[in-house]
Amino acid sequence: MVRLGDELPVSRTGPLRSLDPDQACNQVTGKTKIGTCGFGVAQAEYARTFSCVEVQHTFYQPPRLTTLERWRTEMPADFEFTLKAWQLITHDAKSPTYRRLKRNLSETEKAEAGSFRATAIVNEAWGATLAAAKVLKAKTILFQCPSSFKQTAENIARMEKFFCSIDRQDLNLCWEPRGDWNAEVVRSICVSLELCHVVDPFIGETVTPDRYYFRLHGRSGWRYQYELGELKELATSLVKSKRGYVFFNNSKMTEDALKFCKLLDEA
């Protein structure tokens, strides 16, 4: 499905590669910013090619603030970081992603982590996420939920309490629900809590088309490479007057992002 309504991290692709100097996507295409989830090439090369990146490390274990400061100073002033909120906010401790957590949790902390619970460890995780965003001068934070975070009255109530109580600091907060969530329920949550709905546009349709955030994970998995026709379909569906992000998160993310930049320019 590709519709938009009617209107430094280590790459998973293996060793860092060099980009063709004739390839560049460092301009903002209309109001759409294009990049990858993590760096697939050396950071200096990436900055000459793209205008933004989605930071993955903050989800697993936020780096030291001094490390984030270095990332910020090494990139151009107008380069944009978006980042994923720490998993302690969204994912229960039984999630396999906790294998990359670099701290030992007590049994109490394990029971109180994740699912937007009103607990000390979730509040601490939000504070760490907010601190990372401040250092990176990030304007957008993504809350990615696992498919185990079901559409229940309890989970919705937890979300409402969390987002109504935190210090948002005028940040653009984005939510990526996974699993079987009803579109009208998602729309209601996003409107009432002022959230941007995050989707893979080849799988679902965003309920917040005026400010979209697309994450392309590969139609049949991470190793998938998008065909030119698929990227053209997405490019023509975007309304350039609207603001949004398109991040590639597949094995060929850098190449696909570059192809998409060119197609969007031509659309």
Predicted regions and their residues:
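Residues lining hydrophobic/aromatic ligand-binding pockets adjacent to catalytic sites
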Residues: 2-5, 11, 16-267
